[in-house]
Design a protein with these regions (language model features):
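Terminal transmembrane helical anchor/hairpin motif
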Residues: 1-14, 135-202
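Long, hydrophobic alpha-helical segments
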Residues: 18-41
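Transmembrane helix-loop junction
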Residues: 41, 85-89, 121, 145, ...
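Hydrophobic/aromatic residues in alpha-helical transmembrane segments
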Residues: 31-35, 83, 114-115, 191
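Helix-loop-helix units of permease transmembrane domains in multi-pass membrane transporters
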Residues: 38-68
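Secretory targeting signals
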Residues: 1, 7-9, 13-26, 64-126
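Hydrophobic alpha-helical transmembrane segments of multi-pass membrane transport/permease proteins
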Residues: 1-2, 22-30, 132-139
Length: 202
């Protein structure tokens, strides 16, 4: 069946391009705002001393806050998926494409959330943490746009959007998954190291 734009592109692809692409842009702005208070509020309210002296490890503190962010984003993405899946009552959907888009968006936001947690641990001012997170996330998302074509292939390996784009096209490469996992792990470990240094120095 041909004729309308959605039918030509495929209903699932048409919706994914509209919904998930828009969601990725919105969450690029929202995630820094959500994560900027995770640690900075602890500094400002002077509860960090009590938190670090509690009978839990720094790793548990950071992972708890980070997993809370992941669960929040997972809930938002799940809501989007449910809304799209409701259309399966009337149209045929490509569930594989839907799942790869959802996974790609979750991995993208997981990386930005880890970055936000790290910058939140650097300052007691939430606005500064949010700004640094947004600036850094935007740089990693758009980094491939800033370089000439002869270096673009190399630079694209560091672009979050380049890796996310494969998921958006329904392609799930192990390299893309590993990139996002290493990206998030790096910033989580840096946050733990930051708190460890602070605890040692008092």
């Amino acid at each position: 069946m041909r004729g309308s734009l959605p039918e030509q592109m495929g209903m699932t692809q048409f919706m994914c391009e509209g919904i998930f692409d828009t969601a990725s842009i919105l969450l690029l702005f929202m995630t820094p705002l959500i994560s900027m208070r995770l640690m900075s509020d602890e500094y400002r309210s002077q509860t960090m001393t009590f938190l670090t002296s509690a009978p839990i490890t720094l790793k548990e503190i950071i992972l708890g806050k980070y997993l809370a962010l992941i669960l929040y984003h997972s809930f938002l993405i799940a809501v989007m998926l449910v809304m799209i899946l409701m259309l399966s009552l009337w149209v045929e959907l490509d569930y594989g494409l839907l799942l790869t888009n959802a996974l790609g968006l979750l991995l993208l936001m997981s990386g930005i959330a880890a970055m936000g947690l790290f910058f939140s641990s650097q300052t007691q001012y939430a606005v500064i943490a949010g700004f640094l997170t947004f600036l850094s996330a935007s740089s990693f998302v758009l980094i491939e746009k800033f370089y000439a074509d002869n270096t673009q292939n190399f630079i694209s390996h560091f672009s979050m959007m380049s890796h996310y784009r494969n998921f958006a096209h329904g392609l799930m490469h192990s390299f893309d998954v590993v990139f996002f996992m290493l990206f998030a792990t790096f910033f989580v470990l840096m946050t733990i190291h930051r708190l460890h240094i602070q605890r040692v120095n008092g």
